Amino acid sequence: MNKRRAKGKSHSIRPARAGAPKWVRLTREEVEMLVEELAKRGYTPSMIGIILRDQYGIPLVKQIVGKKVTQILEERGLAPQIPEDLFNLIRKAVNVRRHINEYPRDKTAKKGLEEIESKIRRLTRYYKGIGKLPQEWVYDPAKAELLVAGAS
């Protein structure tokens, strides 16, 4: 019945490797400095990982440093206040809501907005549980639009 999440089985698998690859010449400190520098330029954690992969040949920061990109950013005080995946869902909901205001009879978009907002609520519950979001944080569409406008 629930086919929405049953699709999309094709993906790459990370190699099971404990240490850093042989071709990476950067040290642990240099990689941490690169992560910090890219974060100060305004890149998100996922974009930092993509830049390190494509431009510096670092397949996975955790293999070299022993910490994830977000852990490095949290230590340096550069981590985003709202986790990146939640923020991307909020941005998507704002865009769909803007579309619905322009085309109010678009029932498919309304259904999509309901699904996006339910994902936001589930993810919010998870992040409150692990302590990444304060307990009083609530998703509000009006505030979300201001949040997305301020981040752009």
Swiss-Prot record:
Key words of the record: Ribonucleoprotein, Ribosomal protein
GO molecular function terms noted in the UniProt entry: small ribosomal subunit rRNA binding; structural constituent of ribosome
SUPFAM superfamilies (alphabetical): S15/NS1 RNA-binding domain
Short name of any one Pfam family annotated for the protein: Ribosomal_S15
A GO cellular component annotation in the UniProt record: cytosolic small ribosomal subunit
SMART domains: Ribosomal_S13_N, Ribosomal_S15
Top-level lineage group: Archaea
One of the protein's GO biological processes: translation
PANTHER family assigned: RIBOSOMAL PROTEIN S15P/S13E, SMALL RIBOSOMAL SUBUNIT PROTEIN US15
Description of how the protein assembles with itself and partners: Part of the 30S ribosomal subunit.
HAMAP family: Ribosomal_uS15_A (MF_01343_A)
Family under the similarity heading: Belongs to the universal ribosomal protein uS15 family.
Protein name: Small ribosomal subunit protein uS15
Organism the protein comes from: Saccharolobus solfataricus (strain ATCC 35092 / DSM 1617 / JCM 11322 / P2)
Name of the gene encoding the protein in the UniProt record: rps15
